[in-house]
Curated annotation (Swiss-Prot):
Origin species: Bacteroides thetaiotaomicron (strain ATCC 29148 / DSM 2079 / JCM 5827 / CCUG 10774 / NCTC 10582 / VPI-5482 / E50)
HAMAP family reported for this sequence: Ribosomal_bL12
Protein name as it appears in the record: Large ribosomal subunit protein bL12
Physiological role: Forms part of the ribosomal stalk which helps the ribosome interact with GTP-bound translation factors. Is thus essential for accurate translation.
Subunit architecture: Homodimer. Part of the ribosomal stalk of the 50S ribosomal subunit. Forms a multimeric L10(L12)X complex, where L10 forms an elongated spine to which 2 to 4 L12 dimers bind in a sequential fashion. Binds GTP-bound translation factors.
Superkingdom of source: Bacteria
The family this protein is said to belong to: Belongs to the bacterial ribosomal protein bL12 family.
One Gene Ontology CC term in the entry: cytosolic large ribosomal subunit
UniProt key word Ribonucleoprotein: yes
Pfam families found in the cross-reference section: Ribosomal_L12, Ribosomal_L12_N
Keyword Manganese found: no
């Protein structure tokens, strides 16, 4: 099992040149057409590089209402334009997503508003 894990680790860390060499060996010696596998392996490191880029879209997640539940319900109601019952249900159902796909400054502003009301909030 450890050998397979080490092999998988080596496979994931291959460079594009090494992936191309592996594709050639698989085709010539074993008759395997590795086109789809080569694309998947080559995309692995690129996907990791994309994750390093700064996020531009954030979700505001209410983790808990804290002690001042009423104030948090009011803040959620105003921020989301919800009715009182919907806002209360959202707060009671924590953890819950308050808003999705916000710009960084909007998300931080909403987070600050909810935290000032007493909520525990997280940006994802």
């Amino acid at each position: 099992m450890a050998d397979l894990k080490a092999f998988a680790e080596q496979l994931v860390n291959l460079t594009v040149k090494e992936v191309n060499e592996l594709a050639t060996i698989l085709k010539e010696e074993y008759g395997i057409e590795p086109a789809a596998a080569a694309v998947a392996v080559a995309a692995g490191p690129a996907a990791g590089a994309a994750a390093v880029e700064e996020k531009t879209s954030f979700d505001v997640v209410l983790k808990s209402a804290g002690a001042a539940k009423l104030q948090v319900v009011k803040a959620v109601k105003e921020a989301c334009g919800l009715g009182l019952k919907e806002a209360k249900d959202m707060v009671d159902g924590a953890p819950s997503v308050v808003k999705e796909g916000l710009a960084k400054d909007e998300a931080e502003s909403l987070k600050k508003t909810l935290e000032e009301a007493g909520a525990e909030v997280e940006l994802k």
